[in-house]
UniProtKB/Swiss-Prot annotation:
UniProt GO BP: NAD biosynthetic process via the salvage pathway
Lineage of origin: Bacteria, Pseudomonadati, Pseudomonadota, Betaproteobacteria, Burkholderiales
Protein name: Nicotinate phosphoribosyltransferase
Family, as annotated: Belongs to the NAPRTase family.
GO molecular function, one term: nicotinate phosphoribosyltransferase activity
Pathway: Cofactor biosynthesis; NAD(+) biosynthesis; nicotinate D-ribonucleotide from nicotinate: step 1/1
UniProt cross-references to InterPro entries, sorted A to Z: N/Namide_PRibTrfase, NAPRTase_N, Nic_PRibTrfase, Nic_PRibTrfase-Fam, Nicotinate_pribotase-like_C
Posttranslational modification: Transiently phosphorylated on a His residue during the reaction cycle. Phosphorylation strongly increases the affinity for substrates and increases the rate of nicotinate D-ribonucleotide production. Dephosphorylation regenerates the low-affinity form of the enzyme, leading to product release.
EC number from the UniProt entry: 6.3.4.21
Keywords for this protein: Ligase, Phosphoprotein, Pyridine nucleotide biosynthesis
Enzyme class: ligase
Species of provenance: Burkholderia orbicola (strain MC0-3)
Catalytic activity: nicotinate + 5-phospho-alpha-D-ribose 1-diphosphate + ATP + H2O = nicotinate beta-D-ribonucleotide + ADP + phosphate + diphosphate
Residue numbers of Phosphohistidine PTMs: H217
A single Gene Ontology CC term: cytosol
Gene: pncB
Length: 399
């Protein structure tokens, strides 16, 4: 079985799930799967994927896992008590061949948000591992280890990068769970203090690594349906987050509606309240410069704030960003696929995104064309109008 623990997921799933329990326990949602890599035939592996998901739904949290979560300063005891009773229910997920007949598969997760939020990460990890264990029956781990050593060597070679730290954000697109664990341990041992931690809660617990994560796009997307007014949904999301965490876990995700809309909403109050912001699409250099100017304009010293970069990073790009912004702010870098699925094979670009909440469409308007995902063109156009965002040519609804 690929997933053997419900902790084998990203920390931000638990931090968001706690908000859902306390503030949105009645919300119902729908998620859909998409493979952005052209020409990939996943249909032959449907039965294997279903079997693995069935195994996932048989799992429960065990006492040692619950105790670990309970020790986190921002996790409340009633949430851990809820998790002690929790399991994923197979009735909320369906996996079928796409009617398009082109090798794509449809994975639909639909049900109470509180009971479906933990599906996404392990299901993506399952799809990845099932695909690669069938297409690469004798993995070239030697090549993977050599590439990983070169990355560690590159980051650790220059004294001026001694304070440049990276984190593992690679659970969802990892080659396999065995390889992921080896990567995390190799980074811990090879980078020392330059390894900031991992988003994977299981490996954090097992190997005494710092777990990292705050919020994901789905949280702010859901607020489109849960908040009082669509135009204020991003503000509402940040306010509810602050209501739950009271200043803790203060990294705001910036690209659900694009950078312009984020800066309009992220006023002096949020600039001072939140520790920083996370970049996940668009030009990271331009984004960083705009964030620093925004902090200064809102009477915040940028040197006290954290800029988190997590969009398709590799080590050279991390180093370029560090060179640009070091000394001007605090920096954090989350590296995903380039760490956990770099053995010489083409990684799958797969996602599971929320598309509805309480029966209403929800969407992400990314700073990167092609990253937006919404199955309702009329709603997408309306959302752009509300937030004053031009429609890019790549997403012309007439196509």
């Amino acid at each position: 079985m690929i997933i053997t623990s419900l902790l084998d997921t990203d920390l931000y799933k638990f931090t968001m799930m706690q908000v859902v329990l306390h503030h949105f326990p009645a919300a119902n949602v729908e998620y859909r799967f998409r493979c952005r890599t052209p020409g990939v035939d996943l249909v032959p592996y449907i039965d294997e994927i279903r079997d693995e998901v069935r195994g996932l739904c048989s799992l429960r949290f065990v006492d040692v896992e619950l105790d670990y979560l309970r020790r986190m300063r921002f996790i409340k005891s009633d949430f851990v008590d809820f998790l002690a009773l929790f399991h994923l229910n197979e009735k909320y997920i369906s996996i079928t061949p796409s009617p398009k007949g082109n090798g794509e598969i449809d994975i639909v997760i639909e049900g109470p948000w509180l009971h479906t939020i933990l599906f996404e990460i392990p299901v993506l990890a399952i799809v990845n591992e099932v695909y690669f264990r069938n297409t690469q029956r004798e993995p070239d781990y030697r090549e993977g280890r050599e590439r990983l050593r070169e990355k560690i060597k590159l980051l650790g070679a220059k004294p001026e990068f001694a304070d440049c730290k990276i984190a593992d954000y690679g659970t969802r697109r990892r080659f396999s769970k065995v390889w992921h664990e080896e990567v995390a341990l190799t980074l811990r041992d090879g980078l020392g203090p330059q390894f900031a931690g991992t988003s994977n809660v299981l490996y954090a617990m097992k190997h005494d690594i710092t777990p990292l994560g705050t919020m994901a796009h789905e949280y702010l997307q859901a607020c489109q349906a849960l908040g009082p007014r669509l135009r204020d949904s991003q503000i509402y999301g940040f306010e509810m987050w602050a209501k739950e965490y009271r200043g803790d876990l203060g990294i705001a995700l910036s690209d659900v509606y694009g950078m312009d809309a984020f800066l309009n909403d992220f006023d002096m109050y949020f600039c001072k309240l939140f520790d920083g912001a996370r970049h996940d699409s668009g030009d990271p250099f331009e984004w960083g410069e705009r964030m620093l100017r925004h902090y200064e304009a809102n009477r915040c010293d940028p040197r006290t704030k954290v800029l988190v970069f997590s969009d398709a990073l590799d080590i050279p790009k991390v180093m370029q960003l560090y060179e640009r912004f070091r000394g001007r702010c605090k920096l954090a870098f989350g590296v995903g696929t380039n760490l956990t699925n770099d053995l010489g094979y083409v990684p799958l670009q797969i996602v599971i995104k929320m598309v509805r909440c309480n029966g209403q469409p929800v969407a992400k308007l990314s700073d990167s064309p092609g990253k937006s995902m919404c199955d309702d063109k009329a709603y997408l156009a309306y959302l752009r109008q509300v937030f004053g965002i031009a429609q890019p040519v790549e997403e012309d609804a007439s196509k």
